[in-house]
From Swiss-Prot:
It is found in: Cytoplasm. It comes from Encephalitozoon cuniculi (strain GB-M1) (Microsporidian parasite). ATP binds at A82, Q83, S84, G85, T86, G87, K88, T89. This is ATP-dependent RNA helicase eIF4A. The Q motif is unique to and characteristic of the DEAD box family of RNA helicases and controls ATP binding and hydrolysis. Residues 252-425 form the Helicase C-terminal domain. Keywords: ATP-binding, Cytoplasm, Helicase, Hydrolase, Initiation factor, Nucleotide-binding, Protein biosynthesis, RNA-binding.
Amino acid sequence: MKQVTEQAEDFVDTRSSGTEIREFEDLRSDSSQIRMFDTWEDYGLKEDLLKGIYSIGFETPSFIQKAAIQPIIDGRDIRAQAQSGTGKTGAFAVAALQICDMSQDVTQILVLASTREIAAQNAARFEDLGCFMGARVALLSGGSPIAADKVALEKKPHIVVGTPGRVEHMININELSMDNIKLFVIDEADEMLKAGFQEQVKSIFRRITNKDEVQIAMFSATYDEEELRVSEEILINPVIIDLRYNDQTLKGIRQYFIDLRKEPPFRKGREDYLLPKLVTLYDIFRKQRLGQSIVFINSKEDARIVYDWLIRHEWECELISAELTQAERERTLNRFRGGTGRCLISSGLLSRGIDIQNLSVVFCLDVPSFERKSTYIHRIGRSGRYGRKGIAINIVYEHELKNLKAIERFYNTTIKELPADFSFQ
């Protein structure tokens, strides 16, 4: 497979079943072509949108942005797949703001996300990019008062970003109109098309007045066969963007494991079971000079154990899990983003979509089941974002290696045993 040259990147081919864009394939020409551009000016974007783009430091489009923005502007459905941290949110936000008519006091863009944290981050990106355009953005999600959402919708937002449950509720009580939707964005689409969200997403889609004409854009780092099947029911002649970099090997992230061999033979509870992992983690913290890191573990109960143990050993950290209120989670994230705390313990809420700029290392204290293998990709994708280098360390027992190796084979990636003399510098 050849790497695409800069000249070849300018065009991709359109087929009768849709358009497919792959970064590391020869691009075959066809009668109709979609143009990709190297600079923001080349897109012919609104002047005030360009100001917003440059004000937040977007110097040039990333590859996913090159591939996705123009098809959306041209009115095409798209299904985009790209590794975490490549600029997917910026891609659909820029395109949406370009096609949105700010002179119309109606909601034209609807963006769904699986968690409030991701929805809030997406809404903030729209606000930042649209700050010179007069773009009005409303965030609708569980955990906030219904009354506050009603007030937000009374301001006639151009763009609504939210979680499926709250968005559906606001539609049902006639507070959110679907009469003028131009673009329906499904972020973290692999999660949104799973059984837990799928019916809500379909229900919301059915409520869009002009659903035969509305554009749909799906973005994710992973899709499985069932999710692809569901997407085919919704999308019409889509542009398919697949930028996974050789079957999900996450570019720029070095992946390692530490094999602790047998789990403790005698234990009274979960802390005893986790103790060898906690000691190993603490030893790394003490001996290495690390920037900020995230520690992932599957359950909120285990996350609390890890947090309490580190606090008892006087290691500065933060905890974010489902046991916290929404307000507490937001305060925790804001503190951590602001540089408070060396590490953040997460039960999984942060494995998707959340962007923490200065994160250098991700630690995984357990391995997701093979059925939830995409969780691994989303976890380690918190490091190495936007082309920066990252490190992922899996601290595991012998029996967990089977799952880790199965994930390694499935994604055609490399997870090495951590060398004894490894330096995080």
